[in-house]
Amino acid sequence: MLMFVGLGNPGAKYARNRHNIGFMAVDEISRRHGFSPWRRRFQGETSEGTLDSERVILLKPTTYMNESGRAVQEAAGFFKLGVGDVTVFQDELELPPGKLRVKVGGGIAGHNGLRSISAHLGNDYRRVRLGIGHPGVKELVHGHVLSDFAKSEMPWVEALCQAVADNAGLLTGKRDSTFANKVHLALQAKGFLDKGDAGAA
């Protein structure tokens, strides 16, 4: 069994925020693969199903971003999952819109959701970093991540979440590079990434 965690803030006020692209990604995985209806538990919401014959639980912490680790720790403890069984889908300022990277371990790059998870679970979980772009200067970061995607951005956001969901089964077999390549190729085909943007790096 594996756990895929989408990061975000709960409630309609935050639903379309850039900071909530992790929620959007796991919502799409649940929808496209016929997972169970979301239900409240573990200080979050869960949906369960199967990807490539592997049982997967999706978790959206409802603790607010800064306390995400509490929900992840509670769910991981209940299912007896190790840190290596956890994959976190997060927004990433340092990647251009629509690009992603997959990495096990590493720093938190100022991301409060990752900081909380690392404090509660350790650092060696897998991160799927979903690019939202940087506003250009540090002072604008807070407002950038907590503002909604513009209407003009939604086509690439939806395409990214769909490609992540379509290829999520590759993550159950730790085929991270293949997953990243297939997602990037899907966005290229729709004109959201240039050909030079493909690849897992």
From Swiss-Prot:
Looking at the record's lineage, which domain of life comes first?
Bacteria
Matching entries from Gene3D superfamilies are given as: Peptidyl-tRNA hydrolase (3.40.50.1470)
What positions does the entry give for tRNA binding? Y14, Y64, N66, N112
- Keywords from the named record: Cytoplasm, Hydrolase, RNA-binding, tRNA-binding
Subcellular location, in the record's words? Cytoplasm
UniProt record, GO biological process: protein quality control for misfolded or incompletely synthesized proteins; rescue of stalled ribosome
- The active site consists of H19 (proton acceptor)
Q: Which GO terms describe its cellular component?
A: cytoplasm
Q: Where is this site: Stabilizes the basic form of H active site to accept a proton?
A: D91
The EC code for this enzyme is 3.1.1.29
- A GO term for molecular function: tRNA binding
Chain positions of site Discriminates between blocked and unblocked aminoacyl-tRNA: N9
**What's the catalysed reaction?**
an N-acyl-L-alpha-aminoacyl-tRNA + H2O = an N-acyl-L-amino acid + a tRNA + H(+)
InterPro entries named in the record: Pept_tRNA_hydro, Pept_tRNA_hydro_CS, Pept_tRNA_hydro_sf
A single Pfam family, by name?
A: Pept_tRNA_hydro
Question: So what family is this one in?
Answer: Belongs to the PTH family.
Q: What does this protein do?
A: Hydrolyzes ribosome-free peptidyl-tRNAs (with 1 or more amino acids incorporated), which drop off the ribosome during protein synthesis, or as a result of ribosome stalling.
Which PANTHER family does the entry link to? PEPTIDYL-TRNA HYDROLASE
| Assembly and binders | Monomer.
Quote the protein name from its UniProt record. Answer: Peptidyl-tRNA hydrolase
Q: Which organism is it from?
A: Bradyrhizobium sp. (strain BTAi1 / ATCC BAA-1182)
